[in-house]
Amino acid sequence: MENGKLFVVATPIGNLDDTSKRSLKTLNDVDLIAAEDTRKTRHLLSHFNIKARMISLHEHNEEEAAKKLIKEIKNGNSVALVSDAGTPAINDPGYRLILQAHKQNITVVPLPGPCSIISALSVSGLPSDRFCFEGYLPAKSESRKSKLKELEKDERTLIFLISVHKISRSLEDILLIFGGDRIAFIAREMTKIYEQCIRTNLGELLKMIEVGEIPKKGEFVLIVEGCKENNDDSLVLARDLMGELINNNLSSQAVDIVTKVTKIKRNIIYKMMLELKKEQ
């Protein structure tokens, strides 16, 4: 019996009109759809009057679900893999299924379409010839700062996903490690009614979040300029000055002095002082 195929189908990230004709035809024709959340996928399918057999495939059951789906394909059935929004396996479930399909010599067919990180990058005005997608940063501040220090000197454009609950704390740590001068682009609610895309520097971006100019709603794609020789000047100055003040036993005045000289937010400077004291 000839194997079926695995179709990796991108779905809208907000606007249903972004669904391609080819995607709709594939979803209508396949024998089975593997969905991250069958309830959300059913909403998409019902909008386009598509009736299909579905199976759930998410991060907690992917290994077991992949075995069942490979068996279906080996029996000649074609399967479409979809995520809740965007392109499957890009920071979403699907990798294990796709890997097993390749190992079993099953044809894997990509159906291009919406992808939040690529959509944001394309309009960011930042270099896209070399970029690094880091997904979500670690939840805990110490681990987050450790990861950011690894990326501090990376010259590539950096792309992060940040949840609404961690946007302020994540930006504070990013400023602490990268400084406030780097160009940054943030995209929120892309393709939806309240879509918001803003290009500024990291320092201004945090201010806009804190005063509510950028609402803490939805999921954020943050794109940050890669390291350049001159884009961390204020941070280098702040660290050097802070180090001198600490060495001269002026810690009690250091935060106020460095904040005044560099114009970097006080809480960022305070965190910097704590970091430098740990290193001594």
Task: Go through the PLM ranges and name each one.
Residues L27-I33, I106-V109, T157-L158:
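Short active-site oxyanion
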Residues M1-H60:
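Glycine-rich, flexible N-terminal cofactor/catalytic loop recognition
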Residues N3, T157, V164-Q280:
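A contiguous loop/helix-start segment that scaffolds small-molecule binding in enzyme catalytic cores
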Residues R96-D154:
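Class I SAM-dependent methyltransferase SAM-binding "motif I" and its flanking Rossmann-like core
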Residues L57-E63, L137-K140:
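Conserved helicase motor
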